[in-house]
From Swiss-Prot:
Organism field: Shewanella baltica (strain OS223)
Keyword terms of this UniProt record: Cytoplasm, Fatty acid biosynthesis, Fatty acid metabolism, Lipid biosynthesis, Lipid metabolism, Magnesium, Metal-binding, Transferase
Name of the molecule in the record: Holo-[acyl-carrier-protein] synthase
Catalysed reaction, written as an equation: apo-[ACP] + CoA = holo-[ACP] + adenosine 3',5'-bisphosphate + H(+)
Keyword field contains Cell membrane: no
Pfam family, one: ACPS
Encoding gene per record: acpS
Amino acid sequence: MAIVGLGTDIVEIERIQAHVARAGDKLAKRVLTEAELAIYTGHSQPSRYLAKRFAAKEAAAKALGTGIGRGVSFQHIHIGNNEDGAPTIHFTEGALARLQQLKATVGHISIADEKSYAIATVIIESQ
């Protein structure tokens, strides 16, 4: 296996909170998949959840080498959790096409947050 992509992103949680206060759920609806949006709406800290997902998807898009745009949207990247609570990443549509173009087989993700920031790193491996 070889690493074919690496991406990292950091988000100031307060910036997301301010955006939500100003524009409501507009950003959440643009960034989150339907399943993620369902979690967001019931989450005890929705702005923190959104900041972590935003950072994760930006990191994934950087690892794909496209960024958001150029055929890859936030909606093409789903961030979930396995049964132990560890984050998982799933690619669809344009993100999946780019993953296949890279001949990649797996994506690894790490997400962390502290008082003011959310950070995510994504590694993409090929066979």
